[in-house]
């Protein structure tokens, strides 16, 4: 995958998608289209299309952002120390496009490993199960059998 140029990204992404993925912005809580959204499918990086999260691992954390217990594949995301805003957090970025996705916290469901991947909806695109094969994500159909 070759990451699109800054100019290409500005032409294809909304202002919010660009600010979140390229400038590490955070969308307002409870404003993203996937916060209260529970259809079966996968969530991919809005920039590169790389698979990130499954709806099977999504839950309502009540925080205002889509929350997941884990990524589809651990190697699909990278974590980075974030000391911005006077806090110490762990930032989550996509592996290939290096898009800012959100942060991971240790206050998730204990029975699922205790992690909460708090992700900006603006960094994601949802691919429903019915479209996985057609859009090139057929290998993930087995998650939903």
Curated annotation (Swiss-Prot):
The active site is at residue 118. Pfam families: SelR. PROSITE patterns: MSRB. It catalyses: L-methionyl-[protein] + [thioredoxin]-disulfide + H2O = L-methionyl-(R)-S-oxide-[protein] + [thioredoxin]-dithiol. Signal peptide: none annotated. GO terms for biological process: protein repair; response to oxidative stress. The keyword Flavoprotein does not apply. Residues 6-129 form the MsrB domain. The keyword Zinc does not apply. It comes from the Bacteria. Induction: By cadmium, lead, mercury, copper and manganese. InterPro entries: Met_Sox_Rdtase_MsrB, Met_Sox_Rdtase_MsrB_dom, Mss4-like_sf. GO terms for cellular component: cytoplasm. Its EC number is 1.8.4.12. Keywords: Oxidoreductase, Stress response. One of its GO terms (molecular function) is peptide-methionine (R)-S-oxide reductase activity. HAMAP family: MsrB. Belongs to the MsrB Met sulfoxide reductase family. This is Peptide methionine sulfoxide reductase MsrB. It comes from Enterococcus faecalis (strain TX4000 / JH2-2).
